[in-house]
UniProtKB/Swiss-Prot annotation:
Belongs to the bacterial ribosomal protein bL21 family. InterPro entries: bL21-like, bL21-like_sf, Ribosomal_bL21, Ribosomal_bL21_CS. GO terms for biological process: translation. GO terms for molecular function: rRNA binding; structural constituent of ribosome. The lineage of its organism: Bacteria, Pseudomonadati, Pseudomonadota, Gammaproteobacteria, Legionellales. This protein binds to 23S rRNA in the presence of protein L20. This is Large ribosomal subunit protein bL21. The keyword Chaperone does not apply.
Length: 115
């Protein structure tokens, strides 16, 4: 079983037990986070595609780590002028472990009168 979730402006294909680095989340280490924006769920032969998201589907994960990526160095220069500008950037991330992919019942029983 796998799902495609959307968080931080990006889409991720996740399975249960998978470790994943996503854009920074506000939760602390050890807390649980629930991703409700599930775009697709595949369970065996069944395939549920959302328009734009699957109803009653959720992916639960546990926050494992908060950190920063490796530094990316940016160098801008103008040729023949000995003009250079150096800059670095480190993106914040949250490492999560996917604990559960839940696909709720979208169909609800409707009670009708026997009249």
């Amino acid at each position: 079983m796998y799902a495609i979730i959307k968080t931080g402006g990006k889409q991720y294909r996740v399975t249960e037990g998978q470790m994943l680095k996503v854009e920074k989340l506000a939760q602390d280490v050890g807390q649980s986070v629930k991703f409700d924006d599930v775009l697709m769920v595949a369970a065996g032969d069944e395939l549920h595609i959302g328009t734009p998201s699957v109803k009653d589907a959720a992916v639960t994960a546990e926050v494992v780590d908060q950190g920063r990526q490796a530094k990316i160095e940016i160098i801008k220069f103008k040729r023949r002028k000995h003009h250079m500008k150096r800059q670095g950037h480190r993106q914040d991330f949250t490492a999560v472990k996917i604990t559960e992919i839940a696909l709720g019942k979208a169909k609800k029983e409707v009670k009708t009168d026997g009249a």
